[in-house]
Amino acid sequence: MAIFSDFNFYNRCGVIMVEQVNFRTRQYNYNTINSVKSAVNTSYVKNLSVTPTFTASVPITSKAPQVASLKMRTTLDSKEEKNEYTTILSQLDKNGRKIVDNLLKTGVLLNSDSNDHSTVLDNLYKIATEPRAEGLDSKTMLKDTIAAIAYPYIITQQFGDIPPEYQQRVVAANNENKTNLIDIWQGSQDVNVEHSGTCVAASTEFKLAKQLPAEFARFAQELSSPKLSVNKTIGLNNLADETLNAIWLLNAFEIPFETNNFNTAKLNFAPDKNAIFRAKIQTTNKDPYERTPLDVLMQSTFMQIGSQQSYNSLTDKRAGKFNQNDKGLIEFEKTFTESVVFDKNILSVTYQTVDENARLVGYETDLGTMKKHLTTALDEGENVIIGYTQTDNNNIIVNGHEITIVGYKTDDKGKVTFICNDTDDNIPRAIEYSEDYLLPKIHHAALPKHIVEGDLNIVPNWTEGIDMYKQMKGAA
């Protein structure tokens, strides 16, 4: 297993540089053990210089519109919309009103590319006027939702500390039904989370806010409401080629769902029962660079989806049938989560060839093809979540991380620079990596099926899941 870690950054001559990998942090894990197909010289991987820089403004994510089928609206057409708009503005300060006005002028506020065709405006209005879950504040949730949609780079995975006045209640909640003294002591220690394992969930949250703002607003509204859950109707063919295999996946991940036909299913997503404790604390005690209450609810929900409903927000740990590690999500779980959240046929494309000792020995395709896959997806309006690795001097994978590629630019020599977002760097801006640095480090990328199926023989997510489950059952 690869142990994922965050990076320590420092400022040198005004440019943010990577100093070292923090080996103390168990941040995220995925299964990198695959059969060796071909040997490729990878000696240059470990010798690359690490020189990421930061963009000064929000990058253009693609050359193609993200929602080409929707007509962009920038004018409030009805009395209802005007009333919703006025009501929202009345609950914001001057800066907040300016941001909402800009969302209207850019077509984001009236975007309706959500599962129920509600607009960003509709859902912000509900947040502002309808009750929130106990302990949550409407104005805080409204402000945080607007901010995340307007500038998703502020989304972070950094846990907040538990203030003394909450400590006893949180420990009691975490130790519920425990009788063993050692377990009780450990439970009291586990609630003090120093390093987050939610990079997949935070990257999913970022992508949802950036790529589907209306759906993000709908999730924010529903998850912070008294019911603390959101329904989503998906196409079963986006999970598997056959309906029964899609149903198997939903059951395997323990997702509550209803089916009325062989084509679609209505799923129910919810944060874990302890997420509300974290969300309440962040409502009143949020420090700079920590998660907002909205981040808590979103990331808990996505962790629940991927971990077979086994996540605990108090400890940032999970159980579940597919992962023996108690932190983060493995690649298969990540792909399932992204597929149901975005209702798309997402494939996790593994690019690195790794032997049974977690040694990077080659690639499944050449780096040029990898670059083509990424730039094609970006040109189609996709934000691409990738897992990249760090190796030691013997090319043994020791660390890695999950980030999102949001765009790219090409210089006059044809060299590509990828524009990325990292939810764990405490820097609310995009970061840039050259293709020479990033491409050799990419272990996997979540890409639409049609982009890669002609170049690589990809095992579908449901097939991988069934095989993995059979292997684990056989070993039990």
Regions found by a protein language model. Give the residues of each.
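Active-site nucleophile-adjacent alpha helix/oxyanion-hole segment immediately C-terminal to the catalytic cysteine
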Residues: 81, 95-96, 101-113, 117-324, ...
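A generic structural signal for solvent-exposed, polar alpha-helical segments
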Residues: 10, 222-225, 254, 357, ...
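Intrinsic-disorder/low-complexity loop/linker signature
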Residues: 14, 26, 96, 254, ...
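Active-site signature of cysteine proteases
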Residues: 19-51, 59-60, 68, 73, ...
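Low-complexity, intrinsically disordered export/secretion signals at extreme N-termini
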Residues: 4-101, 105-109, 121, 126
